[in-house]
C-alpha cells in the first residue's frame, strides 16, 4: 500500500477569454482531445469533460502531490500553447477558474451535470450557472 492516499475530487470550470463563444462543436471536440492528452501526459486524472461555446467543465481527481491551481495552470497553459498559432482554431482562456470539491457520493450527479451542459445552457447563462453552483455548495 502506498504511504499516501487521497480521494480528492474537484469540479473545475473556466471560461474562454472574455467569455467569447469560440468553442464551436468541432473545435470543442478538438480542445477536449487536447486537454485529455495534456492530462494524461501530466498524470492528471481527468474523469470527464464537457462545456459549451464559452466555458468548460472538468471533473478531476487529485493525486497526493497535486494542487488545484497547478493542475489548472498546466491544462490551460498547455492547451493555449497548442492552439495559439492557428488562427482557425485559436483558443484563449480567461484568467482564473472555479473549483468545487465533490464528495464520492455525488460523483454520479456531477458527471451527469457535466455531460448535460448543452441542455443546462438552453435557458441559463454561464453567470447564472456559476451563481447557482456557488449557492448550492454553501453550508
What name fits each language-model region?
Residues 1-139:
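Basic nucleic-acid-binding interfaces
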Amino acid at each position: 500500500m502506498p504511504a499516501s492516499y487521497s480521494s480528492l475530487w474537484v469540479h473545475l470550470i473556466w471560461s474562454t477569454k472574455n467569455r467569447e463563444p469560440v468553442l464551436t462543436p468541432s473545435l470543442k471536440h478538438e480542445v477536449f482531445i487536447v486537454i485529455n492528452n495534456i492530462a494524461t501526459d501530466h498524470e492528471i486524472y481527468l474523469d470527464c469533460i464537457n462545456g459549451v461555446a464559452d466555458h468548460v467543465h472538468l471533473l478531476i481527481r487529485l493525486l497526493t502531490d497535486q494542487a488545484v491551481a497547478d493542475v489548472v495552470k498546466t491544462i490551460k497553459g498547455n492547451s493555449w500553447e497548442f492552439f495559439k498559432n492557428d488562427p482557425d482554431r485559436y483558443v484563449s482562456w480567461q484568467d482564473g477558474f472555479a473549483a468545487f470539491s465533490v464528495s464520492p457520493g455525488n460523483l454520479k450527479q456531477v458527471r451527469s451535470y457535466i455531460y448535460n451542459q448543452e441542455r443546462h445552457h438552453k435557458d441559463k447563462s454561464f453567470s447564472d450557472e456559476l451563481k447557482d453552483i456557488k449557492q448550492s455548495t454553501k453550508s
